[in-house]
Amino acid sequence: MNHRISFRLMEAVSGDTLEVFLDERLSFKENFKMLKSLCEKDYTKAEVYDPYKKVFLDRNTSLSEFGFQGFVFLKLFL
């Protein structure tokens, strides 16, 4: 996981919405897996959504229905 993202999450409080920039060195699929793992493991009540499609990411979201435009928003419910 990107250390910058981890650090920002550690300082976040419940209800915060963080802008998360995707790692350009990773493929679309790798970025998707990284964000999905945030929701499923570290922050089980987090929601990630594409600001253009307004689709929330959870453990049932498939790669084909989710598109990234360079960044997403992560909202925490701790």
Regions of interest found by a model, annotated:
Residues 1-78:
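Ubiquitin system architectures
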